[in-house]
């Protein structure tokens, strides 16, 4: 019976059938995947009952902890009324209510919401929207994009093109878009020898030069908000943003 299997059994079965994302499958020969049974708060428990502290918040997505009673109840309530509906030509009250509440918290000038199911897909949609905007307003030469060096935007082709980390993109370079790359600010290892808080944000000069040189052909600039996570948690200087 499946529930009579131990953690080692489940790990072997996992590796027989599954490719895991963002990892080297060869590493699993010596460090098998942890097979999780359930979670509670900040803790995860494997199928043998061993407890783990979820210090990465399940890839930064679980801000309120596992099995939060309010969230669980809301999910159960929703399942009893509507589990899924096509979003083209249809809508539903939870989506409308959510957008209405979010509108109260976002900066002025932003007035519409577009849903996607993951970060990479949202980047792809944003790139297509920005291109289409310029195409429909007579700027059809704007067919390229700018992004910062060492950035990370996702694993799909457009998002991977915008990223600046060879660890993720080196193999796929023949497939990727031609991106205008701008040197990212790095206050910890400032190439100009400046100190954060005492400089004039000279790192913006490279961005201004890129805009002057390539602005007429670029549809958008892609920037991670607040910091570059995969580059080593690099915080942007406020003046740069």
Predicted regions and their residues:
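Active-site-adjacent loop/helix segments that line or gate small-molecule/cofactor pockets in enzymes
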Residues: 3-40, 90
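Glycine-rich loop-to-alpha-helix module at the N-terminal edge of alpha/beta enzyme cores
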Residues: 7, 51-140, 146
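Short beta-strands and strand-loop turn motifs
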Residues: 53-56, 183, 220-226
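A short, flexible beta-alpha/helix-coil linker loop
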Residues: 58, 81-82, 186-189, 225-229
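PLP-dependent aspartate aminotransferase-fold enzymes
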Residues: 100-219
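Active-site core of PLP-dependent enzymes with the aminotransferase class I/II
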Residues: 199-200, 206, 227-241
